[in-house]
Amino acid sequence: MGRLIRAQRKGAGSVFKSHTHHRKGPARFRSLDFGERNGYLKGVITEVIHDPGRGAPLARVTFRYPFRYNHQKELFVAAEGMYTGQFVYCGKKATLMVGNVLPLRSIPEGAVVCNVEHKVGDRGVFARCSGAYAIVISHNPDNGTTRIKLPSGSKKIVPSGCRRMIGQVAGGGRTEKPMLKAGNAYHKYRVKRNCWPKVRGVAMNPVEHPHGGGNHQHIGHASTVARDAPPGQKVGLIAGRRTGRLRGQAAATAAKADKA
């Protein structure tokens, strides 16, 4: 019998330990309170830091508690143009400036925003990676919802009370710079997850993978497998409708879908 293949080893059944060493902390908005619902709070950016495993930089913002003498420190996903010493305003009556946090109902249509909440008070879900942004399309005051365009191009309707940050996430164009050498990829994935380097199945021995073995690297049989194939056999094109290059009508349909 062959060995357990990679898909079986990474499957359910083992204790997962997240790669969180040296992480600075979760990046999210302040907890929604009375001050943000009815006015605004003023904070100052004390430092802009790098978070290992995250493409976008983080901004450490210090607020004063509205009802007691104390300071509150939060980590925000930094927007393009943020700087140390900048004042950040969070709340319903904050001004429309890059880095400020307002509810969607206070944003004009066509504005560029980032770190958008999905539900009121969840502290930011959408458009958070480096260079990402969402666009406010329209408001519906009748049912209190707002339609936004996400970085993927899909449209989504969220409550108008959801908060978001004005501007685009910093670090845009990060993926356009080539890795150039394996050492850079090693350091990148070392702080992310155990997924590098990834050996191809055809480069393995037959005891290690269904695609392994042979005098030259080839699968040796059809790469399509059934949907109900057992673990260890279920590798390749799972329940594939077709194989090979897209030609003719299929290529035209795929090109039309990419443009949409």
Swiss-Prot record:
Known SMART domains for this protein? Ribosomal_L2 (SM01383), Ribosomal_L2_C (SM01382)
A Pfam entry, by short name: Ribosomal_L2_C
Molecular function (GO) terms listed? RNA binding; structural constituent of ribosome
Q: A single GO BP annotation from the record?
A: cytoplasmic translation
- Where's it found, cell-wise? Cytoplasm
Which protein family is named in the record?
Answer: Belongs to the universal ribosomal protein uL2 family.
Q: What is this protein called?
A: Large ribosomal subunit protein uL2
State the organism of origin.
Nicotiana tabacum (Common tobacco)
Q: Where is the organism placed in the taxonomic lineage, from the top?
A: Eukaryota, Viridiplantae, Streptophyta, Embryophyta, Tracheophyta
- Gene, per the UniProt record: RPL8
